[in-house]
UniProtKB/Swiss-Prot annotation:
This is Small ribosomal subunit protein uS7. Keywords: Ribonucleoprotein, Ribosomal protein, RNA-binding, rRNA-binding, tRNA-binding. Part of the 30S ribosomal subunit. Contacts proteins S9 and S11. Belongs to the universal ribosomal protein uS7 family. The keyword Glycoprotein does not apply. GO terms for cellular component: small ribosomal subunit. It comes from the Bacteria. Pfam families: Ribosomal_S7 (PF00177). One of the primary rRNA binding proteins, it binds directly to 16S rRNA where it nucleates assembly of the head domain of the 30S subunit. Is located at the subunit interface close to the decoding center, probably blocks exit of the E-site tRNA.
Length: 156
């Protein structure tokens, strides 16, 4: 493993339709087996569905959903003596965004609608309204951190 320096972050180009870098990252996470055009079709289809169903600006709904799912705090395992403690730590903004994207996609994949675009649009609308499994996951994470607040002095 390299020890000298951190690798520089790769620049992610904004998506072609909306010109949004975060949406581009989201598409890359939706993508399976390198099929980017399929992922683009799914995400753009979901955003169109949001526009028709909710009569709201789809990019605004997307960012609202993402912000509602972003965790502010999480627990990490820390071994002290013979015991392992779940220590609450603050989440860096880039990790917070990555977790929110991951949770939104996994919650959408677990839904029962017929198409992935339909599942994704449903989950994004739910998350924008502070409902759905992705928001539940964030609340569970925060609850876990609150329950283990006594171990916060083990932070590193």
């Amino acid at each position: 493993m390299a020890r000298r320096r951190r690798p520089e972050k790769r620049e992610i180009l904004p998506d072609p339709k909306f010109g949004d870098v975060v949406l581009s990252k989201f598409m890359n996470s939706v993508m399976l087996d390198g099929k980017k055009s399929v992922a683009e079709g799914i995400v753009y289809g979901a955003l169109e569905t949001i526009e028709t169903r909710a009569k709201r600006e789809p990019l605004g709904v997307f960012h609202e959903a993402l912000n509602n799912v972003k965790p502010g705090i999480e627990v990490r395992s820390r071994r002290v003596g013979g015991a392992t403690y779940q220590v609450p730590v603050e989440v860096r903004p880039d990790r917070s965004q990555a977790l929110a994207i991951r949770w939104l996609i996994s919650a959408a994949r677990a839904r029962s609608e017929h198409t992935m675009a339909g599942r994704l649009s449903g989950e994004l609308l739910d998350a924008a309204n502070n409902r759905g499994n992705a928001v539940k996951k964030r609340e569970d994470t925060h609850r876990m951190a609150e329950a283990n607040r006594a171990f916060s002095h083990y932070r590193w």
